Amino acid sequence: MAMGSGGAGSEQEDTVLFRRGTGQSDDSDIWDDTALIKAYDKAVASFKHALKNGDICETPDKPKGTARRKPAKKNKSQKKNATTPLKQWKVGDKCSAVWSEDGCIYPATITSIDFKRETCVVVYTGYGNREEQNLSDLLSPTCEVANSTEQNTQENESQVSTDDSEHSSRSLRSKAHSKSKAAPWTSFLPPPPPMPGSGLGPGKPGLKFNGPPPPPPLPPPPFLPCWMPPFPSGPPIIPPPPPISPDCLDDTDALGSMLISWYMSGYHTGYYMGFRQNKKEGKCSHTN
């Protein structure tokens, strides 16, 4: 900071504001900043005094004329629009107006004009809604046609993307369905345990998932050796999940599929733990 006089600067240079390690306290981070505050106040006072006497000229932080360039351009555009003559609207003219509810452009017809307030009342074609609009805000009917064409193009693009995604999802479901038919239940794995309340025992045919199953149960207790079927040396083949029908596209069916996957995950986890325990008990019986 520039100082007003040389004497003040030399006096401040001789003043020691802070020296670490000279305090009596062991904590060197706690120190008195009174001298620093006094030096700052003194420097500010001397600068203000020199500025008041005219020794120092205050220079602005920003150059003049640079901060208002953009508003100047805006004013030019406003002047240009003001110089261009507005269209002389009449009662009964067709126009396009922006509806205040959604901000979209709709075709309308002028029903009344207030030249003093430069406003008018328009009726939207095909809707019958009335709304007051400024005469300067009215658009030609061709603007509405261009806007509707652009909206139709965007809707068509979104529809095409939606159709592509649906086609890809259906193809994936058909592939999963064909794979599930090609890989039926094998003798390496027993069928999943019955659902609560179904009345079907393990190994009985006709196990179906008619509705969303309950949350996945806890892993089953340790399996008995008599319950475990013989296992081959290779790893078991895990059956695929039940195929999802193409007509089941609501959230209820998606929730049911998720709960089924949880149920199957808990079943296979308990099945693996029982297999390990059965194998461990078999080793212990051989050693004994």
Swiss-Prot record:
Origin superkingdom: Eukaryota
GO cellular component term of the entry, any: cytoplasm
Single GO MF descriptor: RNA binding
Required for interaction with RPP20/POP7: annotated segments: 94-204
Mutagenesis or variant effect for Y267C: Loss of interaction with SYNCRIP
Covalent cross-link Glycyl lysine isopeptide (Lys-Gly) (interchain with G-Cter in SUMO2) as placed by the record, residue numbers: K48, K204
Stored CDD domains: SMN_C (cd22852), SMN_N (cd22851), Tudor_SMN (cd20398)
Pfam family, one: SMN_G2-BD
Phosphothreonine modification, residue list: T22, T66
Compositionally biased intervals (Polar residues): 146-162
Keyword entries, A-Z: Cell projection, Cytoplasm, Isopeptide bond, mRNA processing, mRNA splicing, Neurogenesis, Nucleus, Phosphoprotein, RNA-binding, Ubl conjugation
Composition skew (Basic residues), residue ranges: 65-79, 170-180
UniProt-listed GO biological process terms: axonogenesis; DNA-templated transcription termination; microtubule depolymerization; positive regulation of RNA splicing; regulation of neuron projection development; spliceosomal snRNP assembly
Residues annotated as domain Tudor: 88-148
SUPFAM superfamilies: Tudor/PWWP/MBT
Tissue distribution: Expressed in motor neurons.
Region span, P1 (binding site for GEMIN2): 10-41
Region span, P2 (binding site for SNRPB): 235-262
Modification type Phosphoserine: residues: S5, S25, S28
Localization (cell): Nucleus, Gem; Nucleus, Cajal body; Cytoplasm; Cytoplasmic granule
Principal location: nucleus
Complex formation: Homooligomer; may form higher order homooligomers in the dimer to octamer range. Part of the core SMN complex that contains SMN1, GEMIN2/SIP1, DDX20/GEMIN3, GEMIN4, GEMIN5, GEMIN6, GEMIN7, GEMIN8 and STRAP/UNRIP. Part of the SMN-Sm complex that contains SMN1, GEMIN2/SIP1, DDX20/GEMIN3, GEMIN4, GEMIN5, GEMIN6, GEMIN7, GEMIN8, STRAP/UNRIP and the Sm proteins SNRPB, SNRPD1, SNRPD2, SNRPD3, SNRPE, SNRPF and SNRPG. Component of an import snRNP complex composed of KPNB1, RNUT1, SMN1 and ZNF259.
Its biological purpose: The SMN complex catalyzes the assembly of small nuclear ribonucleoproteins (snRNPs), the building blocks of the spliceosome, and thereby plays an important role in the splicing of cellular pre-mRNAs. Most spliceosomal snRNPs contain a common set of Sm proteins SNRPB, SNRPD1, SNRPD2, SNRPD3, SNRPE, SNRPF and SNRPG that assemble in a heptameric protein ring on the Sm site of the small nuclear RNA to form the core snRNP (Sm core).
Description of its domains: The Tudor domain mediates association with dimethylarginines, which are common in snRNP proteins.
UniProt record similarity statement: Belongs to the SMN family.
Protein name according to UniProt: Survival motor neuron protein
Species in which this protein is naturally found: Mus musculus
